[in-house]
Amino acid sequence: MKTEMLYLSAPELLHAEARIVAISDRDDGAVAVAKGGGQPADSGWFELPDGRHIDVRNVIRDGEGIVWHVVDGLDPDVHVGAIVEAKVNRPSRYYNSQLHSAGEAVAAAVHFAGYAHWSVQTACHFPGQCRVVFNDHGTTKDLEVVATAIARQLEEMVQDDFPIRLAYAEDLDELNAVHRLEEGKHFAEWPVRLVSPKDGLS
């Protein structure tokens, strides 16, 4: 059974009741963000009905869409059918989200600084390793001029408290209606979360 990604529809949700579906450290609904999309996994814990905690060391999503919560051993009270409260470490979640949003802001700044033809090749939002790598398609002559223009654009966006919008697309038609895609771009699973400037990218 595919795990429902509760954090996609309600990113502010930091806890939810979950039912253990197998003694393999996975449940049927995940508020924890799994490692992926250039962002580290959430940290958190399962709270048992009697108030005891089981720390979650890692969160992994497998190829079948099942989210696995990796824990250090299982409590005897954790069994198939048991109900636990899955809780996310708030400071860690928001720090990782801020780093991810910063990467999105850099991509928007590149676009608005006049480099809309650049494409993102990869992005990493891990603490201490944050970066967005672009392909300029061989058009850049002076990197210092480009870096200055992008930095200036980013500063303006921050000073103006640049608004963003968050949307979800359930299929390719819906995605193309709200977002310009690169040729050949594809997604392994749906829904796709879109983060863009409030007025969109042309």
Question: What residue ranges belong to the model's regions?
Answer:
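A glycine- and charged-residue-rich anion-binding loop/surface
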Residues: 1-202
